[in-house]
């Protein structure tokens, strides 16, 4: 009965976290609008080999992540949940793999369910797993790779070992087709500490070639197909997207070595109090035959690799969370049989986070905030109340697990529930009107649908326009952003209109129909005075629509 109740509670939490709130949240630019539009264009064109974005070649990532994202729009249409379905699906499958591995490493199914609970309700896992990016899909393949390696190493027969290594290669091959060569490096460095400690070199060298071969076999058809269709793909993808991003001084998203430490600590909420003990247990496991040290290497080695890399984004460390969830579940299992100090500390952390969030909203971000730079407007008192309630829920469950830790520590999983359910409604208007272009697009849909040409100076906004209007011919105004490479091809001529060319371009092209220019204004809200006067203007925060009617 307890087993059924545990699964039922987990299912209810999953629905409340990953299903209920997602349709109502507007898409964020640039990430969600980008991946929504790439999949829409892939489905519309039927070309599942060469990724295109706004009708241009887009070689920042391989293709398998888009295939998974395509499923959402293919099954559920063009809603916001459909766009996020790929991330949710990948997160669920990763959680099932966490259960599978935890069931083998921990004693009994209950700790394995706890591992899934910790994984699905960790802040970073939830935030990224309900957000339309490729990292949850990549994490799925990396989790599958690490589970496959463990399966192979624990097999007692040569056939079983071979099967595990073949699955390892297939997972790495799919990871490679999702985010590139990183998928081949992460499993290698992740297993290295355990292989050294357990002296598993023989099986690694005997069966490792099977993994290499299966990775090649699953990825080779697309590798050859993309090379045939686009001969420059591999040069650009390898040099620009790997060497420059991870190693060179001009890498994108540069950040210091310690960048990921606070991301990890915040991302592990509401389970942060369990981290020190879990890491300690993992280190102690280096001298045993158990899996604790394997999990520790899986968590730490990729974390160090990402920290060394020049380019950094918070989502990159998502593959580290599956092993940490299992380590923490094992640590909790030992705690409940000994003393619950770490559980009380975890409850205290959550109580303080909840109270701190409430204080930040009421004293800093509210219209009456003490800093004089509020995030909420005077007309958004309702949103202030909702935000306060969201963090109040966090504090409530934190207090419950603090004062009744042995009985109610699992309710830490509900700490994020208020944020998950209310964030879409409680988001400040100035955030919505700079990061969620649907706020403007849906208000101006008749004007945009009537436009012969549409331009934007923001790639993320342009992607939102293309996805909402179901047209890929959105032109860039003055800026290229991440479309610089695609715009460099001769057949992309005309997709970029520079600011100094715009008056003449406008005079010529408005003869064919109305023209809409959608701008993402700078933070100071200044509008370029050199822009031609528009026939219609609509502004929502930093989003500005200028429409020019057709003229003979």
Swiss-Prot record:
The keyword Transmembrane is annotated on this UniProt entry: yes
Membrane-spanning parts: 4-24, 81-101, 113-133, 176-196, 207-227, 255-275, 289-309, 313-333, 351-371, 384-404, 411-431
GO cellular component, one term: plasma membrane
One Pfam family named in its UniProt record: PMT
Membrane topology recorded in Swiss-Prot or TrEMBL: Multi-pass membrane protein
BP-aspect Gene Ontology terms: lipid A biosynthetic process; lipopolysaccharide biosynthetic process; protein O-linked glycosylation; response to iron(III) ion
Pathway participation: Lipopolysaccharide metabolism; 4-amino-4-deoxy-beta-L-arabinose-lipid A biosynthesis
Domain of life: Bacteria
GO MF annotation, one: mannosyltransferase activity
EC number from the UniProt entry: 2.4.2.43
The keyword Transmembrane is assigned to this record: yes
Reaction catalysis annotation: 4-amino-4-deoxy-alpha-L-arabinopyranosyl di-trans,octa-cis-undecaprenyl phosphate + lipid IVA = lipid IIA + di-trans,octa-cis-undecaprenyl phosphate
Cellular compartments annotated: Cell inner membrane
InterPro entries assigned: ArnT_tfrase, Glyco_trans_39/83, LipidA_mod_glycosyltrf_83
Family: Belongs to the glycosyltransferase 83 family.
Alphabetized NCBIfam families for the sequence: PRK13279.1
Entry function: Catalyzes the transfer of the L-Ara4N moiety of the glycolipid undecaprenyl phosphate-alpha-L-Ara4N to lipid A. The modified arabinose is attached to lipid A and is required for resistance to polymyxin and cationic antimicrobial peptides.
The name this protein goes by in its record: Undecaprenyl phosphate-alpha-4-amino-4-deoxy-L-arabinose arabinosyl transferase
GN (gene name): arnT
């Amino acid at each position: 009965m307890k087993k059924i109740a545990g699964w039922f509670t987990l299912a209810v939490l999953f629905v409340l976290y990953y299903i209920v709130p997602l349709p109502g949240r507007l898409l964020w630019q640039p990430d969600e609008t980008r991946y929504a539009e790439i999949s829409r264009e892939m489905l519309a064109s039927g070309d599942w080999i060469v990724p295109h974005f706004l009708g241009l070649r887009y070689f920042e990532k391989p293709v398998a992540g888009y295939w998974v994202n395509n499923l959402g729009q293919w099954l559920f249409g063009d809603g916001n949940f459909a766009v996020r379905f790929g991330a949710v699906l990948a997160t669920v499958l990763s959680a099932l793999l966490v259960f599978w591995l935890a069931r083998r490493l921990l004693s009994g199914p209950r700790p394995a369910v706890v591992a899934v609970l910790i994984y699905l309700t960790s802040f970073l896992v939830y935030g990224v797993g309900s957000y339309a990016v490729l990292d949850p899909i990549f994490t799925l393949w990396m989790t599958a790779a690490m589970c496959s390696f463990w399966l192979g190493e624990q097999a007692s027969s040569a056939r079983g070992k071979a099967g595990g290594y073949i699955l390892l290669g297939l997972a790495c091959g799919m990871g490679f087709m999702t985010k590139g060569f990183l998928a081949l490096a992460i499993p290698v460095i992740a297993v290295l500490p355990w292989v050294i400690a357990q002296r598993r070199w023989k099986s690694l060298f005997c069966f490792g070639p099977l993994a290499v071969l299966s990775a090649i076999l699953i990825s080779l058809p697309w590798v050859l197909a993309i090379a045939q269709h686009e001969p420059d793909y591999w040069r650009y993808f390898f040099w620009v997207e790997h060497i420059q991003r991870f190693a060179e001084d001009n890498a994108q998203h540069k950040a210091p070595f310690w960048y990921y430490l606070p991301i990890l600590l915040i991302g592990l909420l509401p389970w942060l109090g369990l981290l020190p003990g879990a890491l300690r247990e993992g280190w102690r496991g280096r001298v045993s035959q158990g899996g604790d040290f394997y999990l520790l290497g899986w968590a730490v080695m990729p974390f160090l690799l990402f920290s060394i890399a020049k380019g950094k984004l918070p989502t990159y460390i998502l593959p580290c969370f599956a092993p940490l969830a299992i380590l923490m579940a094992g640590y909790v299992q030992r705690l409940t049989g000994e003393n619950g100090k770490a559980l009380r500390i975890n409850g205290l952390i959550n109580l303080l986070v909840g109270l701190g969030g409430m204080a930040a909203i009421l004293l800093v971000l509210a219209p009456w905030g003490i800093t004089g730079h509020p995030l909420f407007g005077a007309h958004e008192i309702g949103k202030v109340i909702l935000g306060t309630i969201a963090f109040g829920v966090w504090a409530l469950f934190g207090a419950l697990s603090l004062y009744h830790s042995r009985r109610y520590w699992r309710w830490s999983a509900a700490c994020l529930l208020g944020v998950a359910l209310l964030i879409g409604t409680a988001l400040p208007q100035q955030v919505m009107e700079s990061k969620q272009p649907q706020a403007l697009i849906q208000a101006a849909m008749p004007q945009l649908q009537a436009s012969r040409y549409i331009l934007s100076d923001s790639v993320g906004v342009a992607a939102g326009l293309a996805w909402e209007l179901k047209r890929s011919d959105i032109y860039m105004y003055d800026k290229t952003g991440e479309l610089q490479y695609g715009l460099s091809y001769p057949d992309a001529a005309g997709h970029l209109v520079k600011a100094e060319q715009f008056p003449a371009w406008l005079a010529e092209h408005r003869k064919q129909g109305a023209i809409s220019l959608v701008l993402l204004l700078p933070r100071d809200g200044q509008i370029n005075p050199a822009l031609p006067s528009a026939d219609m203007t609509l502004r929502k925060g930093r989003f500005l629509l200028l429409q020019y009617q057709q003229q003979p």
